[in-house]
Regions:
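Long, low-complexity or tandemly repetitive, helically biased scaffold regions used
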Residues: 2-155
Length: 155
């Protein structure tokens, strides 16, 4: 990353109380390209990962899908756990549409605010809750047993 981009981020970091760039890169596993607008690139990298979680983890569990696993996974979570996931889902959808608006109408200040808001939501809610769900589903699959019922027709 160019020193120009780094200094630009540092300036915005101080102004908007943004997370350390290295923390963002490590958490969301991305590298920055030299010639890109730094906030657009950071926003795009973060949004790609968060929205992937939505599509691969949250949506199938709360809404179902055509996959065989969803039939079981929906039953592995309680109504309360599914409601928590839906509440997170709504917050991520807000981020998604704010992100879409920033793609249509780029604004560096709003992009910086979006990064901060997303970072806080990730650390305060998303990561912890999704980790719990992943652990629970993994454990549930590990202990899942088919019940064999033999129905005898006595008619």
């Amino acid at each position: 990353m160019s020193s120009k981009n780094f200094h630009k981020y540092r300036k915005m970091q101080d102004k908007f109380d943004l997370p350390q760039l290295n923390e963002l890169k490590r958490t969301f596993k991305f590298d920055l390209e030299e010639n890109e607008k730094i906030f657009d690139q950071i926003r795009n990298e973060i949004s790609e990962r968060i929205f992937t979680f939505t599509e691969k983890i949250i949506e199938p569990v709360i809404a179902g899908s055509d996959s065989y696993s969803c039939i079981f996974e929906q039953e592995m979570l309680s109504d309360k756990e599914r409601q928590k996931l839906f509440d997170i889902y709504k917050k991520i959808q807000v981020l998604k549409w704010e992100n879409n608006l920033l793609m249509l109408q780029p604004d560096e200040k709003k992009a910086a605010e979006w990064v901060k808001k997303t970072w806080e939501l990730w650390n305060n809610e998303i990561e912890g809750e999704l980790s719990k769900v992943c652990r629970k589903l993994s454990n549930s699959w590990d202990t899942l047993k088919f019940m064999s019922e033999h129905n005898n027709y006595n008619g």
